[in-house]
Amino acid sequence: MITNIGYFQFLPEFLKVRKNLDVIKSLIKKNNNEIKKLDLVIFPEYFLSGPLKFDLIKDYEKEISSNEILISLKEISKISSKTTFVMGSFLLKQGGKYSNTSVVVKNGEVLTQYSKKALIYNENYICESNNKVAVFTIGKTKVGLAICWDLILPEVFRKYAKKIDLVVIPSFWGIGGNALQAKYSFSLEKKYYTALGIARAYENSFALLFVNSVGKYKSSFYSDRMMGGSYFVNPPLGIIHKTNNKDPNTLHIVKFDLNPLNQYREYYATDKDYFYYKTKKVI
């Protein structure tokens, strides 16, 4: 069984939520002939504003409300009504509290949402989270969500073992002032998040798609180079798709074949082994 997936390495303009929404809407309309053939389309983390500091939250709220964002995303999803959209992630206010949340929308309906667990930098002063995972289906394919730095927490991905076929990870991963990078000719960050994704996929017996923003990003309080390097890993085949494309507005397409993954599950059974050793109380 094949699931047809697309993604954009979209680079937002800092704190210009309405403008970014307009650009995203235009991208979907421009690529609608291709998107109509896709089952799933993903945008990166913070795709509407970029990361914020606590003292910028008032400006964010003046720009647009969380309810208005949700209404806009629902409307955008109707452009291709048969496609499911993972709407990156954004700061979502619910019950008076913010979280870094990814919302899954299809034809104007929210299917599920997921809040980032591994909060980092200014997120610790703005966001709250929970221990809930999110699962939705595309045909017979079950899909889960994680966000960016969650990759460092194996525990998050263990919750999906035997429950999903694919985990999607919207990300906003840059070079981040890595002082160690100057000592090496290759990208440490790309090696880091690629190795983590491969490990999470193989140890839990599911495929993994990492979708990262790309390009030079600038806000009022920091600048960064978003690394791109989005990739798709499908055990036992390994990485079957990776891009070095630097255009944030390019639609990338991946085909997810479930058959190799089912073969991996049958012969390696790393997901079943986890639960076996857990009952033995050795972990």
Task: Please provide the spans of the model-predicted regions.
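Short polar catalytic/cofactor-binding loops
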Residues: 9-15
